[in-house]
Amino acid sequence: MAKKSNSKKSTPVSTPSKEKKKVIEKKSSTAIPRERVIKAVNELIKFTSKPQDENNEEGNNGKKNLLEDDEEELKKDLQLIVVNNKSFTGTSKSFKLKLLNVKHSFYKPWKEASATAVKDFKVLLILKDSDIKKVSEDDLFDQLDSEGIKVDEIICGKDLKTVYKAYEARNAFISQFSLILADDSIVTSLPKLMGGKAYNKVETTPISIRTHANKEFSLTTLTNNIKKVYMNQLPVKLPRGTTLNVHLGNLEWLRPEEFVDNVELISEQLIKAYQIRSIFIKTNRSPVLPLYYNQDVLDELEAKKDKIEETHEDDMVTIDGVQVHLSTFNKGLMEIANPSELGSIFSKQINNAKKRSSSELEKESSESEAVKKAKS
């Protein structure tokens, strides 16, 4: 008789793991949380959608204000306010625009919107004198029309010296255009040829592009670079100061999520390239909404401020019972001077310190009197 096996059949049983799966929190890959940008853009859309006061909309006779359309368009212009820790360009003045990458074209919707605007969206191309006959508007039309891009006029440096040499003629011609592209080999000579007025606006400041490959003019290189600027880049004018305005276009040009994409990408580039302190978003007629601040940069500024204050306190000395601020040179002079003569040597500093003290006391007494009168 066969013995029964005492071993139980090993059947695979799925036992629930006691260990809980760790929930991985998704962190924003950008410096500014996307939700914050979405909320800010939506709030600005709501704000600009509010109707204007009746006094602004209608005149005394009930007719529409002639400037209403312009005001309506202006109040929807979206912009970033970017504050840097120090000057963006230093002491030197730069005529060259900085190009920021964007996910959604800035120029394409601008051109579409210009169909019903006062000013048409037009593109000017400036080439070297030797290249002007190597390409025509028709050649560029064949290469660019599929992308909805049109170069309206092509000129060379010689034209600016002759045809548009007169101040009025030159300014009238340049002001027609919303985008000016120029061969990178001549862009540095254009401020003199175009005049300073052209560089007051971003839209009439020429953007340098490559037109040559292997030291030869190339239609392919030219058209590729035109497409790159038109479809994927946004020009900004870097200021000498610490505050940069980045114009993002009219709120009606793009969908809200497209503006959010562009804001994220632009902010990321600027934060990486500079010591950005803070970033805000607004329209021409709205309050400013905060998007970003860099605590490390703010801490650095605070540390510098504290250091300056400490240095100022260290420079204070007492002469004849008066607290006086002395420069490094005067402190050295004080060390070698006769102590009995310090009052006469630094009489000017002592008198200034006394005046400051008396004015501060007067201010305090006047404030206390004002408080007493308010209480009585």
Swiss-Prot record:
SUPFAM superfamilies associated with the record: Ribosomal protein L1
Transmembrane segments: none
GO cellular component, one term: proteasome complex
Residue span of region Required for interaction with CDC4: 310-376
Key word Secreted present: no
Principal subcellular localisation of the protein: nucleus
Feature: compositional bias, Basic and acidic residues: 357-376
Gene Ontology MF terms in the entry: identical protein binding; large ribosomal subunit rRNA binding; proteasome binding; protein-macromolecule adaptor activity; ribosomal large subunit binding; RNA binding; rRNA binding
Subcellular location: Nucleus, Nucleolus
Assigned keywords, A-Z: Nucleus, Proteasome, Ribosome biogenesis
Region listing for Disordered, in residue ranges: 1-29, 356-376
Pfam families the record matches: Ribosomal_L1
Stretches assigned to coiled coil: none
InterPro entries (UniProt xref): Ribosomal_uL1-like (IPR023674), Ribosomal_uL1/biogenesis (IPR028364)
GO BP annotations, alphabetical order: maturation of 5.8S rRNA from tricistronic rRNA transcript (SSU-rRNA, 5.8S rRNA, LSU-rRNA); maturation of LSU-rRNA from tricistronic rRNA transcript (SSU-rRNA, 5.8S rRNA, LSU-rRNA); protein catabolic process; ribosomal large subunit biogenesis; rRNA processing
Metal-binding among keywords: no
Signal sequence coordinates: none
Described purpose of this protein according to its UniProt entry: An adapter protein that specifically links the 26S proteasome to its substrate CDC4 which is one of the substrate recognition subunits of the SCF E3 ubiquitin ligase complex. Required for turnover of cell cycle regulatory proteins CDC4 and GRR1. Required for synthesis and nuclear export of 60S ribosomal subunits. Required for vegetative growth.
Subunit structure: Interacts with CDC4, PRE4, PRE6, RPT1 and SCL1 as part of the fully assembled 26S proteasome. Interacts with pre-ribosomal particles constituent NOP7.
Note: Present with 45900 molecules/cell in log phase SD medium.
Name under which the protein is recorded: Proteasome-interacting protein CIC1
Native source organism of the sequence: Saccharomyces cerevisiae (strain ATCC 204508 / S288c)
